[in-house]
Amino acid sequence: MLDLKLIRQKPEWAKEKLAARAIKGEEIDELLALDTRRRQVTVQTEELKAKRNDVSGQIAVMKRNKENADDQIKAMREVGQKIAALDKELAQLNEKVTYILVRLPNFPADDVPMSLNEDDSREEYKWGNMPTFDFEPKHHWDIGEKLGILDFERAAKVAGSRFVYYKGAGARLERAVYNFFLDEHQKEGYEEIIPPYLVNNDSMFGTGQFPKFTDATYTITNDGEPLTLIPTAEVPLVNYYRNDIVDAEKLPVNFTALTPAFRSEAGSAGRDTRGLIRMHQFNKVEMVKFCKPEDSWKQLQNLIHDAEDLLQKLGLPYHVITLASNDASFTSAKTNDLEVWMPAQDRYREISSCSNCTDFQARRAQIRYRDDDGKLQFVHTLNGSGLAVGRTVASILENYQQADGSVKIPDVLVPYMQGQTAITKED
């Protein structure tokens, strides 16, 4: 959530920043007008309540002195009616201000490409050599089905489209990938967490998924209370400290978790209908950081490095891009995507998004720490995929495919595959 005080102090700056995220200036004008009226009503209410308290004291004295206080009592009834009307207006104003404020995205950082067009995202650099083949490279879904390690057809029978069965060596490869990821993150100082896979509405609000993206999630009811299947481990990890004060000496705090992610993919009809790229359920290893505001840009670089390190050790070519302002996530001030090379598609595909959310989530979730002066401040939160497991499997199948239809296993994963160096049809 944005700092309303900052919008109040720098309205034109706020309009310019949010225009790069498709927010109209009229929305900010409406917010500020409501905020101004709210502050006026608050002052009027406080003045009337102070007057009521003073006169109530006078009435008590008059009654003790057996003086007639009818006029004062009548006047206080009128004051009470005015206070009740103002309280009602104030509640309505609070609701309207909150409605607008919680739907405004984060301010984009100064070095982000300011554009409403995702094509204006900026490539920063590339790593690795794209593999060359003396045959036409196959798509990962064709490879997986021919090797008998991925079964989309039976998954569709059981659950519908955008689901998959991993089988045999495919299941072992998926497990090898996420165990490798978790081990590497642990070496880098992340604390491994196994969080709840269902979260309440307050948690979804805290990380910014609700109220804007309710259509993109799956929700169940438990004893009349809604619970949402997590779209990412970011939600339970960030909310670990919701309504809490983090010990400043512990900052930065680094969490990592392997969880399934559940997404309805509303609005994705016709996109990536085959393969592992866009699923309703997929495994993902997430990285989350909590830090002091002055450290968050350095921590973003650390986050990117930790994601890159995995791709480099797997020998998978990729590039890093800075997303255009309107392509970044709702909560993010800056997002760097890592996109891995997919030979059969002849293009890069996202495998990690690393975002600095500044104090946006912390303000919604009320996550704070005490500074050197003992004053409460909001932490900054960061999150990144480290990495999306299914997409990693897909990229391994495509980049390491062999002419005979087998797939070589990246060297770093061989120990996780009990020494197996390739997946063949016999596996």
From Swiss-Prot:
Binding site for L-serine: 232-234, 286, 385
Record-linked PROSITE patterns: AA_TRNA_LIGASE_II (PS50862)
Compartments where located: Cytoplasm
Pathway(s) where this gene product acts: Aminoacyl-tRNA biosynthesis; selenocysteinyl-tRNA(Sec) biosynthesis; L-seryl-tRNA(Sec) from L-serine and tRNA(Sec): step 1/1
Residues the entry annotates as binding ATP: 263-265, 350-353
Reactions that this protein is recorded to catalyse: tRNA(Ser) + L-serine + ATP = L-seryl-tRNA(Ser) + AMP + diphosphate + H(+); tRNA(Sec) + L-serine + ATP = L-seryl-tRNA(Sec) + AMP + diphosphate + H(+)
Main localization of the protein described in the UniProt heading: cytoplasm
GO biological process, one term: selenocysteine biosynthetic process
EC numbers: 6.1.1.11
GO (cellular component) term, any one: cytoplasm
NADP in keyword set: no
Keyword annotations of the record: Aminoacyl-tRNA synthetase, ATP-binding, Cytoplasm, Ligase, Nucleotide-binding, Protein biosynthesis
Keyword Transmembrane helix listed: no
Pfam families: Seryl_tRNA_N (PF02403), tRNA-synt_2b (PF00587)
Positions in coiled-coil regions: none
Major enzyme class: ligase
GO molecular function terms attached to this record: ATP binding; catalytic activity, acting on a protein; serine-tRNA ligase activity; transferase activity
Similarity section: Belongs to the class-II aminoacyl-tRNA synthetase family. Type-1 seryl-tRNA synthetase subfamily.
NCBIfam families: serS
Subunit (UniProt): Homodimer. The tRNA molecule binds across the dimer.
Functional note: Catalyzes the attachment of serine to tRNA(Ser). Is also able to aminoacylate tRNA(Sec) with serine, to form the misacylated tRNA L-seryl-tRNA(Sec), which will be further converted into selenocysteinyl-tRNA(Sec).
Free-text note regarding domains: Consists of two distinct domains, a catalytic core and a N-terminal extension that is involved in tRNA binding.
Protein name per UniProt: Serine--tRNA ligase
UniProt source species: Lacticaseibacillus casei (strain BL23) (Lactobacillus casei)
Gene from which the chain derives: serS
